[in-house]
Amino acid sequence: DVQCILTKKQGHATEIAQRLCDSGEELRFYACGGDGTANEVANGIIGYDNASMTVIPVGTGNDFLKNFGDDLDKFRDAENLWDGPQFPMDAIDVNGRIALTIACSGIDARVAADVHKYSESPLLDGKSSYIYSLAVNFLFKGIGSHWTVSLDDTVMEGDWSLVAVCN
């Protein structure tokens, strides 16, 4: 059986995935979107042994899928994904939420957050809204901040433009 559910707000994919996983039924999620949708579904299924996921790339960046090679078309064919291989994947725990491949804070995260705001303009498409966001953040918002980063028993403190933890 296949069920298509449209999300209605930010965080909705996480809520849906958790609710469905609670049934105990064996589930496979096909997150149709980009990195944000993939992250929401992953946060909804983490810790459930009865769920797996893949992504059909229709988002702005689709950076998560680029970790599996340059050919995004293989992920656009839902039939190809139907019985595709499954494998476990590590995740990064960031204050109770998970990140699949990278957790960033600083200039990179600001640029990514602003892309969505600028992409609402009828004059900018996905790529040009990214370039515009990059320019605005570097030219007008500054690039450095003071950070305290704790990782297990290690604490680091300093002024950096970007803090990233990668999986």
Stretch-by-stretch model annotation:
Residues 31-36:
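N-terminal glycine-rich "phosphate-gripper" loop used for MgATP/nucleotide binding
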